[in-house]
Amino acid sequence: AAVVNRLSQGAVTQDFTDIDTIERGLREATDDIALALDEKELGVGTTVTGAALSMLDGEPFWTVFNVGDSRVYLYEHNELIQVTIDHSVVQELVDAGVIRAEDAESHPDSNVITRAVGFNMDAIPDYWVVPVRRGLRLLICSDGLTKEVNREELRLHLAAGRSAQQTAVELIGAALAAGGRDNITAIVVDVVESTGIGESDNTIPRTGPTPTRG
């Protein structure tokens, strides 16, 4: 709640959100969490991910950001792309070639994250820039969804042509039906109109501070 409150306070004062606003919100949320907890709970933190509408060189883009293992996916032309990279022990094992990506979810350390908002320390987000294109869908979700619903199932739900709200409801229902072992969040965002800006750019460049792996 602290993260949502702080990020929304910055977003409602302007049409577009920049990286400075996101990072200020995360710093303030970290302070809020520290004030709300007693000394025994100072190790408590939360993950955060999202997509903020931003301006880059006069053009609208999504600024995608994450801290932890919640994710943002892009669905377009029947293809599902994971935009964010988890800050987790198992992701580091995958990157190092120790385990396969398909084995990460069942690994005993799958719930151990290497970055979070809280812990009485600065949150360090990673950033990506995604062009705003008509027909594009974004899925913003917690690991409570992705641990229960595999990648192909996610793609099929997003491809079904239902409204953003109905798709999110059905994704949560699928996660609950599969066991629902963790908190489940799913938000689907559709781009229904576009000015044509960014229509020819199919890349997802990373921007902002050079990311570090915890």
What are these regions (language model features)?
Residues 1-214:
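PP2C/PPM-type serine/threonine phosphatase catalytic domain
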